[in-house]
């Protein structure tokens, strides 16, 4: 018996509906561990400054009975600062794209704005960690952790065989921060160094965070119990590598850092000039480092296993 036309699949393909899921999958990393863990402070100019002070070294203060007063000069503060940096993104959505029926979202404008917000936050996190200088001019840039932490900076010599992050070195930097008066409570490390820290021989001191809500927000967290206090160890996706594939492990007193905000996040619809709409999302910010002595860095650590 011959097959009828309506029973022949090849003859009715133009009438078949497409099967396109309304679920959009995007696994691009968006966690901003450093920025999410520091406080915020308003700033009032494109160059914000603050004062850093220190006490004299502790010593025996006994004086002779009836001793004549011997005044000393007062403490002189050190003035430091950072330029603000403008971060902005734009997206154009045509009136037609906004009007048509779309898979996975109702409004293209709302969907693209959500993506821009995540991208902007990632860009800010990257700069807050990796920027090494503060620059003026029309295109200003804010110095990040890489540029601020200079004193408790224990670096391997790039190109030598001594490139493995060790527990002794890790604790040496924690001790240096504590000796200077800091109380480091946070470690930022890339995935490779995070695994190295978890594998320290004293790993009985490593405790996995079981706070489900906290892990949901900021991903992997461990607690390392050092001789100078308990420190949270975070895996950061945005610690940049140099040309030799070396990276930095940051040991931070997070209370000494703040996100300085000159212009908060703004989402604006720009004036229409045609058959579409341009969305502008922007913010202006800087990193405030109250006292870099409270934190430390282990630089030039190999971020891949030796071959």
Question: Can you say where each PLM-predicted feature lies in the sequence?
Answer:
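Flexible, glycine/threonine- and acidic-rich loop/arm segments that mediate assembly and lattice contacts
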Residues: 1-307
